[in-house]
A protein has these predicted regions:
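Phosphate- and other anionic-substrate recognition elements at nucleic-acid/protein interfaces
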Residues: 2-3, 11-139
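Conserved catalytic-loop position in the HRD/HxD motif
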Residues: 7
Length: 139
């Protein structure tokens, strides 16, 4: 059983999945959003393929910890998703996850064009790895 993370944006959803031991996060793909039905269908396919038992969704908070418009849209997405996907969902603070992902990609000398295509997936990796590290710390 694995944990999957989602970095939900207005145009894309970055997806990452844990290993079976719940130690490391790997980027899976970036879904280009077209409709909720197609988004949820693809998520269901990935959940089945990776045998996922829990979802972690990045919560885009403001730097002062408050929830803004993007956070409300994420909560709306999750509420609709729960109507078709019956898995526990944990929100995880995603402040600076995209910045950290961008820095990792720059350090790895990934081209600007390639960074743009993988940044959402990498942000999902940062979100999930933070969650997995917390699970290990609390053991």
């Amino acid at each position: 059983m694995r944990i999957m993370s989602l970095d939900v944006g207005s145009r894309t959803i970055g997806i990452a999945c844990s290993d079976a031991l719940l130690m490391t996060a790997q980027g899976i793909e970036t879904i280009r959003r077209t409709s909720l039905e197609k988004d949820f269908n693809r998520l269901q396919e990935l959940i089945a393929e990776y045998e996922v038992h829990e979802l972690v969704v990045g919560m885009p908070k403001n730097m002062n910890g408050t929830k803004g418009e993007r956070a409300k849209k994420t909560e709306e997405f999750v509420a609709k998703m729960k109507e078709v996907i019956d898995l526990p969902v944990t929100y995880w603070d995603e402040r600076l996850s995209t910045v950290m992902a961008e820095r990792q990609l720059i350090a790895a000398d990934v081209s600007r064009k390639k960074r743009k295509s993988v940044i959402d997936k990498m942000a999902a990796v940062v979100i999930l790895q933070g969650y997995l590290d917390r699970l290990q710390f609390n053991k």
